[in-house]
Each structure stands twice: as structure tokens, then as C-alpha cells.
């Protein structure tokens, strides 16, 4: 009994060292609550009630897609505008188009799907798949354009043949329609995203017109439309860089907050 009572007295007593140690303990937050505006800025998707716990446990994959997008579209836009004598409609960038444009965007699309972000999943997945298709079309191993050449084996000649140009222009037409749909959905997020899809819609419209004019040997108008497409793509690239910088600044906690023109408030007011 004496031993048991001694143990109770010993455990009931707290040494000054223990009190000092307990007093020095502080609570460290392990999670951060994002507002609807912050969520839409980081994930480029409206905040819904169906957001799962994974979005709190995993990193934000959206900047990865933006990085792949801008590093692909920026040099391609310079090529389309013919800067420093660049030619070839992007054939020189086949590798970056497939691995940076296609690979990173499709990878991000899968990650957005896991997080439950439907809109960016669809956007990055379809644009990434387009880059895969565009790059593969220019790759001789896929033999997509060679049958349109006179020798049926020359990919470069096939890419500039009237039959190929008339046919491939339809892909640009419907990509433009898809960008228009994305534009309507982006009005729920922010103004920068809306501007990106606006310029991308123009890019595909100009490219389809350019291909059809070049198919009838109207090089003057066709080349001007290609330059116009390159200019619009360059604007989209700069907007993409801006959005990427804004997201990366927020991700590392820099005090500089770049405005992106939140549009969710407009829709919230309309809902009321």
C-alpha cells in the first residue's frame, strides 16, 4: 500500500522543468482554409460542395499544366509569326509539343480528376491530347501526312499539300468551338482565364482560315492569317505566364498578390 501511495504521489507531482517544457509548447496549424476566390484562382475551377479531402492533402497540380502550356505555345507563336526567319509551322518543336505540351497537360488532367476538379481536368486533358495529336501528325513515324504527298512517303511535302490542308483545317475549326465552350465556362472563374480562351478561340479560327487559303495557293492571305494566329497565341502565352506567376507566388506565400479578376462574385450576385 505504501509503495502504491508513493507512486501516486510521484505521478501527481510535476517538476518545474516539466512545467517549463509544457509552457513552451505551441500549436502549429496543419491546414489552411481557402476562400472561394482563392480556390478558383489556384485550381481554375469553381469551389463546390463536392470537394474531397484529397484537395487538402495533395499539392496543386494546376501550375504544372500552365508551365507545360506556356513553354510550348510561346516558341510556337514566335515561329508562326516568323520571328528571326522561323518557319516550318512548328515542326522544329515536335518534341516539346509532345512531351511538354501533351505530356504535362495530360498528367495534370489525371491529377485534377483525382482531386475532383472536373473543369480543369477536361481543359487540360483535351488540350494536352491535341498537342499529342498535333505533334504525332508532324512525326514521320506516324505516317499521317505522307500519304498526301505525290510520293506518298514525304511527310514534309504532305503537310503542305492542298488535300492535307483542306482536311486538317476541320480539326482547328472544332477545336475553336471547344475553346468557345471553355470560354463560357471560364466566366465562372477569373478574367485572365477568360482572356486566354478568347485568344485561343481566335487562334484556331485564324489557323483554319489560313489552311484553307493556303490550300488554294493564296499565300498572301494565308500567311497573314498564320501570323495573326501566332500573335493571338503569343498573347495567350503571356496571359498563361501571368497566371502561372500568380499561382506560384501564392503557393510559396510571397506577399505579392497578382490580381486575376475574380468573376465568381458576379455569378454569386446573379444567383441571389
Curated annotation (Swiss-Prot):
> Which GO-annotated molecular functions does the record name?
acetate transmembrane transporter activity
Which terms in the GO cellular component ontology are assigned?
cell septum; plasma membrane
Keywords of the record, alphabetical order, are:
Cell membrane, Membrane, Transmembrane, Transmembrane helix
Which compartments is it annotated to reside in?
A: Cell membrane; Cell septum
Does the record carry Membrane as a key word? yes
The lineage's top-level taxon is Eukaryota
Q: Name one Pfam family in it.
A: Gpr1_Fun34_YaaH
Family per similarity comment: Belongs to the acetate uptake transporter (AceTr) (TC 2.A.96) family.
Q: Quote the protein name from its UniProt record.
A: Protein alcS
Q: Which organism is it from?
A: Aspergillus fumigatus (strain ATCC MYA-4609 / CBS 101355 / FGSC A1100 / Af293)
